[in-house]
Amino acid sequence: MFEFGSIIVTVIAVFITIPICLYLFLTRHFNFWKKRGVIYVRPLPFFGNLKDVLLQKKYIGYYLKDIYEENINKPYVGIFAFDQPALLVNDLEIVKNILVKDSRNFIDRMVKVDESLSPLNANAIFALRGQKWKHVRTSLTPTFTTGKMKNMFYLVDKCGQQLVLFIEKFAKAENPVAVKDAVERFTMDVTAMCAFGIECNSLQDPKAEFSNLLHRIFQLSFTSAVANLATFFAPWVQNFFRLKLMDSEIEDRIRDIVWRAVHLREKTGEKRNDLLDYLMELRTSETSKLDGDDFVAQAFGFLVAGFHTSSMTLTFALYELSVHQDIQTTARTEIKDVLEHHKKKVTYYSIKDMKYLDMVVNETLRKYPAIPFLDRRCQEDYPLTQDLMLPAGTGVYIPVYALHHDSKYFPSPAKFDPERFSEKNKQNIPHFAYMPFGEGPRNCIGMRFGSMQVKAALIHILSNFEVSPCKETRIPLIIDPKPFNLMALGGVYLNITKFNN
C-alpha cells in the first residue's frame, strides 16, 4: 500500500514538475527588456509576440505596423520572437546607423538556415553570414551592372511579347484575367531563361515542368509558414522541429536543371549573356570561385527572390492602375511618347526615359512592399543610444511596411499617388522612410533587374490593353494573412481589353 502511494505521489509530482519546467524554460528570457528599461510588448509562452501571425490570423506586415503605431513616439520597442528577445526600431536616425553608418556591426541578417535541412536555401546569398556572404556578394555584384542588365534585356522583352499573346486570349473571349497567374507566368519565364538557361514557356504551356516545380516551392501550408517565420525570427525553432523549407526531392531537381544547362553550354559553347553565363564565369574564376551547391544556390536564390516579389509588384500595380484610370492614361501616354523616340521598340534605354512609369512602380512598392521588414543581427555589444547597450546576438527588425504607411512621411498613406515620387516631391521623403529594396551593403542585389522586368511587363500590357475592374474585383483589396509575402486574398481579377490599333 505504501509503495503504491509512493508511485502515485511520484507520478503526480512528475506531471506537475514537467509543465512548470517547460513554462520556466519558455519564459526564461521574458525579463530581458524589463531589465534594460526598454518598453516591450508583453509576450506569451512559446509564441512570444507572434501568436496571431503563427496562427495565420494576421499578415506579419500588419502586425508589426500595429506595434509600430502603438509605440509611434518611441525610438524602439522590445518584442519577442518565440522566446527570443528582439528590437523593433522606429527611429529613422537609428535605422540609418544600423543599416549604413555602423553596418559592420549589423552585416549579418537574422535569417539562418540549417544546411542539413535545406542546402540550397542555406547557401543562397540572402541566408549567408560573415566572410562567406562578403565573398559571394563581391563575386555577384558585377553580374548586375548596367552593361549586364542591358545584355539580358532581350530575354525579358521576349517574355513580355509572349505575355501580350497570353492576355490576348482572355481579351478576345472577354473573360476576366487572373492577374497573379498571368504575371507569375511572365516572371517565371524570365527567371527560367535568365537564371537557369531554359525556356520554361509557361505562358504557352500551363503544364510546363518548370512551372509545376516552382509552384511546389511556393506551395502554402501551415508547416511552411512556420518554417519561414522561424527562419527570420528564431532559427532554433526550425532546427529543433526539423522544419524543411522545401523537399529534398525539389532541391535535387533544381540541381539537375542547373547542371544540365551548364554542361550543355560547356559542350556547345553557347553564350546568351544571361545570369547563368556570368555564374559560369565565376565557376572558373581563381579569385571568385563558386562551385557545387554554392553555385546552384545563387541561381536558386535569384529564382526565390525575383519570381514572387516581381509578380506581386506587377499584380498590385495593375490593380491600382485599373481603379485609377487617370493614372493609367498618363502612364500609357508617356509610354507611347517615349517609344516614338525609340523607333517604337521597348529597350533598356527607352525604359530609363519613362519617368512617370518609374513613379508608378515606386508608389506600388511603397504601398505594397514585397518584404514587410528588414532584419539584422547585432555582432558585438553596441551602444544603440545613451540608455541602451544592445547585447551581441540580438535581432533587430525595421518595419518597412509600417514606415511606408506612416502619414508623417507619406500623407494619406492609403491613397495610391505616384506624384509622391515626382522630381519635386520625392525630395520631401526622408531618407530611410522608403526602403522597398533595403539600404546599405545588404540591400537587394537584384533590385535593378527586378525593377526592369516589372517595367517591361507594364509597358507591354499598357501599350496593348486597357485594364479595368470587373465584378470579381475586390475594392479595396484584402490582404491574405497566411503568406509571408504580401498577397491579395482570393487573387486579383481584372477586365483587360485589347486596343484596336
UniProtKB/Swiss-Prot annotation:
Its EC number is 1.14.-.-. The keyword Metal-binding applies. It is found in: Endoplasmic reticulum membrane; Microsome membrane. Coiled coil: none annotated. InterPro entries: Cyt_P450 (IPR001128), Cyt_P450_CS (IPR017972), Cyt_P450_E_grp-II (IPR002402), Cyt_P450_sf (IPR036396), Insect_CytP450_Detox (IPR050476). Heme binds at residue 444. This is Cytochrome P450 6j1. It comes from Blattella germanica (German cockroach). The gene is CYP6J1.
